[in-house]
Amino acid sequence: MPHSFGAYLILYIMVDLFNYTRRASSVAHIGAIDLGGDNPIRIQSMTTTNTNDTEACVRQAEEIIKAGGELVRFTTQGSREAENMKNINAGIRADGYQTPLVADVHFNPNVADVAALYCEKVRVNPGNYVDPARKFIKQEYTDEEYAHELQKIEDRFVPFLNICKEHHTAIRIGVNHGSLSDRIRNRYGDTPEGIVESCLEFLRICKKENFHDVVISIKSSNTVVMVRSMRLLVEEMEKEGMNYPLHLGVTEAGEGEDGRIKSAVGIGALLADGIGDTVRVSLSEEPAAEIPVARHLVDYIGKKKGHLMIPATACPSFDWLRPTRRETVAVGNIGGNNVPVVISNRINGESTVCENKDATPDYIYIGGKMPKQFVPGQSYIVDYNVYETLNSKPETTGAKLYPIFPAMAMPLIASIKADVKFLTLQFGTPAEEYIACLKAHPEVVVICVSNHQNRLGDQRALVHEMMNAGLKNPVVFAEMYQHGKEEKSDFQLEAAADMGALMIDGLTDGIWLMNNGDIPAQTIDETAFGILQAARLRTSRTEYISCPGCGRTLYDLRETIAKIKEATKHLKGLKIGIMGCIVNGPGEMADAD
């Protein structure tokens, strides 16, 4: 009988939502390096050169290595390419590099057998290793027929494992959401359960054959599917006594700022919960450009290590595996069934006129200062002690003003009349006091802040405390950073990583990004909207699901992406798939329009 997910509620194992610790995994030996266990989180990339072009492959691989890549992957679509990995390996070793090389195999298990002779690791895709190419047809399998298909996989996979054992070659079981087999899709649907079962079918064979140099990946262009699937995989492996190391990545993330933000939302959400042993940030750019992005993301999350314990209690109704949006009462346009709002910080006298109409914040915080101009129809947040004064000025006519209170001013909330009020809270605020206040004032929106070393755990803690108290006030997460405009990419990666798990957990009714530096307010606002779109919570621009390219790509992918973007960037809300080959193309384009 195929594996069932029906008992997950009973066997459900919860990670520590509040205190960072890295998941304990087994160690995979991959050539000169070890992956998993107590080893550093490894950074890797993939070449885009023709694998039959030895010189070009060696050159690009060494660019990746010099940038800090610890593993380099090559596409091996046929036996000829797999055979040439011998020459590529020799060329790189002759230049003094011992970096492990990985062969990427699809559709043909015979190619994997050859690649295992010349590479330190071979990636196989369960969706097309033995199962026939997808035809997207409906076909019902009896349990006996299904078991027969599983036996076919084992009969072909075990000889490959034996070759790997003989040559000390590691493997990656790499499942892609876009290339699930028809067999899996027909039984489990296009779901995280199907994605995970596709992986487990191969892992059970590895375990049975005592083959332990295994790494696993589950990838999707949809960050929510990717994170939920990986969480479920961790849970299911735990049940079956497996703890293989995990490779993280958001496939077809795209390029530029959007690609970085989408990758950071998905990868960051998992790393922040201690999940992940190696990372590849898939960007439609030069492969070496992926390395510093992945490195910054890993190093940033690593700063959580050794933080002061957060003594919080998870809400019993919260489901980490299948989270739904926290139930809240709508306060104005915040919470309830509304999309998450964006609040912009303009306390330094900046103009509150927003030039990018697709990234116009829902609320602008101006503190206690008069801006150069109040925009009619725009909503402003002002400090509670100047709210009534500013609200009575003729300059504010046509604008909407709302007060914000620090925690110490809670007793004054009742004395000020407003349809929407904001209250800044951090975990550790005396619970009895703020809970009583919020119960008495359903018109209050909580601004959740944190200066804790592990701000994700700290902010989760406050919301879970509210949930345990039965509070339904909306919550906006406020995050402060310190970057100059030359560090814009770092700011975007950090903000997306911090917000990733909070959004996928269903806790987010709004986002307020702040920066103590000279990054323009418009850039910060655009980042906030980009993060919400990456988490599939709010669409504000055209979305491009574009792969990074590899040796299978037979055209100039980056030039094509640029042309498509220029022609379609005005089509707000449209998701456009741009694929370099057929491996994931049809499946990942199912997520596009």
Predicted regions: what they are:
Residues 52-63, 108-112, 263-267, 350-356, ...:
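Short, acidic/polar
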Residues 140-153, 184-334, 418-420, 427-578:
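Catalytic alpha/beta core domains of metabolic enzymes, predominantly
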Residues 16, 69-201, 344-457:
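Active-site beta->alpha loop and helix N-cap motifs at the rims of alpha/beta catalytic domains
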Residues 1-13:
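N-terminal amphipathic/basic-hydrophobic helices that include classical n-h-c signal peptides
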Residues 29-44, 49-68, 72, 77-80:
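N-terminal glycine-rich anion-binding loops that anchor highly charged ligand groups
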Residues 335-358, 556-593:
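C-terminal accessory/binding modules appended to enzymatic or scaffolding proteins
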Residues 66-71, 119, 211, 275-276, ...:
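A structural motif
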Residues 14-45, 161, 165, 303-351, ...:
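N-terminal amphipathic alpha-helix/helix-capping segment at the start of soluble metabolic enzymes
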